Curated annotation (Swiss-Prot):
Monomer. Associates with the 50S ribosomal subunit. Belongs to the TRAFAC class OBG-HflX-like GTPase superfamily. HflX GTPase family. One of its GO terms (molecular function) is GTP binding. GTPase that associates with the 50S ribosomal subunit and may have a role during protein synthesis or ribosome biogenesis. This is GTPase HflX. The gene is hflX. Residues 191-351 form the Hflx-type G domain. GTP binds at residues 197-204, 222-226, 244-247, 309-312, 329-331. Pfam families: GTP-bdg_M (PF16360), GTP-bdg_N (PF13167), MMR_HSR1 (PF01926). It is found in: Cytoplasm.
Length: 414
């Protein structure tokens, strides 16, 4: 196991204990032991070195004291800050984003997952090769270069940008294939339920408990990166597809969000979402709020059941309140029958047919309707485009609007 000095910049005293514990868990997952911890209270990072000058000197003394050559910073460094710290301290410096990327690289198993991780790492490293020009000799003209004046640094940058473009094209092709599979699932009429939650909340354990899937379930952060799809038959005989997704984390690095966009978007295919929360985590409320915020940002508009998992680890009973909430233990099976009942109650199994007139200005919706619902008929009228579609009520409400659903069926909002 690698050993490191861990350094934090404390911008928010209230959040610091939670952020500290989470970063130490990330390091443990990565296989790095925190030998010592140092922190500095500052409202904002110092532009050049992240920490103040005096604190940097103190960090250097601790590194020498413990004979360490690795500094792990519990925040995100700019390329300049990372370079300056490495030059001053003469050790390897890694930040929070880099640790997360290394964990992702270890846990990516599918072709898509590996592409996404490579894309994120290249986007992270591209701005960090700046400054290498001082130590790289200049190249003469040759194949792949633009002439005798091009440096190795410029060639490296160009190579990385080219690879990033290739990876983005590959991901686009994978996304198109996913859309084809999604259309087939829709034609089959099998509803989709997505498992989402903070990393290490127990989503994979729950997937295994419900379906016997045998998916890797470890007490590690980001143990699951690749979406896993499994069939589930409810007690009433209804069939559905259950999808496990990559775990969320507070302040998810933007480049990871971009690289894993297509994976995260899988929640938009779902008729129902199970938000799995680690009910025994002391920072449960903070983690729950992070996931809810991300779902809001993603404009998720389907029912969400909050599943408080790991309640068997609680020293004493806790009352979890909520209209769509259930406390369970995926490990022991506690309350799993109640969870299945809630899934049945919240999924609208009956397929309905809706006829609605769209204004011509909303003609762009036709593509979404064809892709996500059964488009039975389409007719152009003087007042707009009349469409007849069939599908689950919630999905129709999502793409046509609940008002259109109510007008067509004479129903009240659910």
């Amino acid at each position: 196991m690698e050993k490191a000095l861990v350094a934090f910049l404390v911008e928010n005293l209230k959040k610091f204990p939670y952020q500290k514990e989470e970063f130490l868990a990330l390091l443990k997952t990565r296989g790095i032991e925190a030998v010592d911890i140092i922190s500095q209270r500052l409202e904002h990072p110092v532009p050049a070195t992240y920490f103040g000058y005096g604190k940097v000197q103190e960090i250097g003394e601790l590194l020498k004291k413990h004979n360490l050559n690795l500094l792990a910073v519990g925040g995100d460094l700019t390329p300049t800050q990372a370079k300056n710290l490495e030059e001053i301290l003469e050790v390897t410096v890694v930040d929070r984003t880099q640790i997360i990327l290394e964990i992702f690289a270890e846990h990516a198993h599918t072709h898509e997952g590996k592409i996404q991780v490579e894309l994120a790492r290249l986007m992270y490293n591209l701005p960090r090769i700046t400054g290498l020009g001082r130590v790289l000799s200049r190249l003469g003209g040759g194949i792949g270069t633009r002439g005798p004046g091009e440096t190795k640094l410029e060639v490296l940058r160009r190579t990385i940008r080219k690879r990033i473009a290739e990876l983005r094209r590959e991901l686009k092709e994978i996304e198109q294939n996913r859309k084809v599979k999604r259309s087939r699932r829709l034609e089959a009429g099998v509803p989709i339920v997505a498992l989402v939650g903070y990393t290490n909340a127990g989503k994979s354990t729950l997937l295994n408990a419900l379906t016997g899937a045998g998916v890797l379930a470890e007490d590690k952060l980001f143990a699951t990166l690749d979406p896993t799809v499994r069939k589930l038959t409810l007690p009433g005989g209804q069939k559905l597809l259950l999808i496990d997704t990559v775990g969320f984390i507070e302040n998810m690095p933007p480049l990871i969000k971009e690289a894993f966009k297509s994976t995260l978007e899988v929640v938009h295919e779902a008729e129902l979402i199970l938000h799995v929360v680690d009910g025994a985590n002391p920072y449960r409320e903070e983690q729950e709020a992070v996931v809810e915020k991300i779902l809001t940002e993603m404009k998720v508009r389907v029912p969400v059941i909050t599943v408080y998992n790991k309640v068997d680890l609680l020293p004493e009973p806790v009352l979890f309140l909520g209209k769509r909430a259930v406390a369970i233990s995926a490990r022991t099976g506690y309350n799993m029958e109640l969870l299945l009942k809630l899934i049945e109650e919240n999924l609208f199994w009956q397929e309905v047919t809706v006829k609605a007139v769209l204004p011509f200005a909303q003609a762009f919706k036709i593509g979404d309707l064809k892709e996500n619902l059964k488009l039975i008929n389409l007719e152009y009228l003087p007042e707009g485009i009349e469409v007849t579609v069939a599908g689950p009520r919630e999905r129709i409400a999502r793409y046509l609007g609940r008002e259109k659903l109510e007008e067509s069926n004479g129903e009240k909002p659910v």
